[in-house]
Amino acid sequence: MKRTFQPSVLKRNRSHGFRARMATKNGRQVLARRRAKGRTRLTLSSK
């Protein structure tokens, strides 16, 4: 049986990246929460 997780950096960044988060109001809320919590990496794309 084929595995369900077929990694793609492009798809990953388009759905979970910084610019994807900034594009919507809720995404910006996610970033604000992570900033408030003190996360060193806000999104997976900011390494």
UniProtKB/Swiss-Prot annotation:
The keyword Ribonucleoprotein applies. InterPro entries: Ribosomal_bL34, Ribosomal_bL34_CS. Disulfide bonds: none annotated. GO terms for cellular component: ribonucleoprotein complex; ribosome. Residues 28-47 are annotated as: Disordered. Coiled coil: none annotated. It holds the Pfam family Ribosomal_L34. It comes from the Bacteria. GO terms for molecular function: structural constituent of ribosome. Keywords: Ribonucleoprotein, Ribosomal protein. Residues 31-40 have a biased composition (Basic residues). The keyword Transcription regulation does not apply. Signal peptide: none annotated. GO terms for biological process: translation. HAMAP family: Ribosomal_bL34 (MF_00391). Belongs to the bacterial ribosomal protein bL34 family. This is Large ribosomal subunit protein bL34. It comes from Sodalis glossinidius (strain morsitans).
